[in-house]
């Protein structure tokens, strides 16, 4: 669903199978609507729903997680599998949130952040390998 360019997906972002990406157009009382803005190097797990939210660079959305309108996932932050980040909630940088509704569990350490970055590199290499294979 794209309304006047209201969905943006950044470089090297990976969206897994079965995920839903959606936005809401402007409407009375909400002249800007709820665009979906996904930064660079983001990982979105299988069957996730991201709906009119913002995911900053290197954010992570776990399998089956939901992020609602105007929610924000900070840089290097992780929304756990199955979590629901409700409307207007804001996750800070390097935070782990889980539950329904999602709440902050803790800050992420360097090892967790590096693990997410390794995932980005893995999927980026998969894309390059696939592109090379179909050219041959």
Language-model segments: residues:
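Short, small-residue-biased leader/transition segments that mark boundaries at the very start
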Residues: 2-3
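Short proline/glycine- and basic residue-enriched helix-capping loop/turn segments at helix->loop/beta transitions
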Residues: 43
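Glycine-rich hexapeptide-repeat left-handed beta-helix
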Residues: 6, 11, 16-24, 28-38, ...
């Amino acid at each position: 669903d794209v309304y006047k360019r209201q969905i943006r997906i950044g470089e090297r972002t990976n969206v897994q199978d079965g995920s839903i990406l959606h936005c809401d157009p402007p409407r009375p009382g909400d002249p800007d609507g709820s665009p979906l803005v996904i930064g660079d190097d983001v990982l979105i797990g299988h069957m996730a729903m991201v709906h009119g939210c913002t995911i900053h660079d290197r954010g992570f959305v776990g399998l089956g997680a939901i992020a609602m309108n105007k929610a924000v996932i900070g840089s290097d932050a992780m929304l756990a599998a199955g979590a629901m980040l409700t409307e207007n909630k804001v996750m800070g940088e390097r935070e782990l949130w889980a539950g329904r509704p999602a709440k902050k569990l803790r800050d992420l350490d360097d090892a967790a952040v590096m693990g997410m970055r390794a995932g980005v590199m893995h999927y980026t290499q998969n894309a390059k390998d696939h592109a090379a294979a179909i050219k041959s």
